[in-house]
């Protein structure tokens, strides 16, 4: 189980990403459309002025059951250990043990 503070930090990051996504997208579109280097520099400074944790690449996928940050399957949102355990218990519909 991950520390509660780490899980809370990720929740906070997700909220910040959602809050600033429109503003960040508008600034990035403006940045890509600008031709003048000085104008681009000005827009870049505005982007840098946004909170660091509002960037979507800082959000880490975590297991919703344990909060573990590694070995998380996107389809289920579970880490590999929980996926195996829940699949064996029949808690994941459509998941069957492979045999050939």
Swiss-Prot record:
PANTHER family recorded: 30S RIBOSOMAL PROTEIN S14, SMALL RIBOSOMAL SUBUNIT PROTEIN US14M
Keyword tRNA processing: no
Family: Belongs to the universal ribosomal protein uS14 family.
Family annotation (Gene3D superfamilies): 1.10.287.1480
Name of the molecule in the record: Small ribosomal subunit protein uS14
Matches recorded under PROSITE patterns: RIBOSOMAL_S14
Subunit structure: Part of the 30S ribosomal subunit. Contacts proteins S3 and S10.
NCBIfam families, per database record: PRK08881.1
Keyword rRNA-binding: yes
GO cellular component term, pick one: small ribosomal subunit
Tree of life domain: Bacteria
Keywords: Ribonucleoprotein, Ribosomal protein, RNA-binding, rRNA-binding
Function, in words: Binds 16S rRNA, required for the assembly of 30S particles and may also be responsible for determining the conformation of the 16S rRNA at the A site.
GO biological process, one term: translation
Cleavable signal peptide: none
GO molecular function terms listed in the Swiss-Prot or TrEMBL record: rRNA binding; structural constituent of ribosome
